[in-house]
């Protein structure tokens, strides 16, 4: 919900907000299973995790349920997934994403004619992804009926926006609902991904990700986390804006249906 079109006070999504103003906003659109893998399994299959089998990130909980003896020559879940709907409708489909490799969830690529993987396993930043998307659009500018899926990880932990982007929110106040009482409750709560162990199981900081703190022990740490997330959202929005600019340059922006979605958000103390 850290988007202007959903009422967030910080200017994190000017480009996506414009799409929202010109299009449709979904107010009752909920992640049916978290984190990433089960959420996307449900998103692309249209089947809740309790039925498709993917309900976690490890062990058998991370595997989709086998169809069993009734499986036909081609898996029917994959054949009827979100991406294949476009392909069966006659569209040429392509994806720029590392998701399938990150989670060994190769079913995610079902339905795409082309798949591009920068090889970062989800640890890459958007400036590695954007050139592939722009190149694809330039090479296919004369093609009709296409579906291009572009995946940016930048709002995801660890926060990895390039330092050269700066911090546009350095002097912008945080939401006031996170008062000292709420912050203290989080500081004294233990467990994976809590304020004490943001990395999941430890509070160590990685020099590779200077925006990403290992813990939140005071309001300075709180600001680092929220600024890190918001910078990731704004950076992704900036990259998405460059895609929109190219579509306008090619004269197809008004004829293109744009879908902006995510597999989950971030729990920032709510």
Task: Tell me what each language-model feature is.
Residues 1-270:
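Catalytic domains that recognize anionic headgroups
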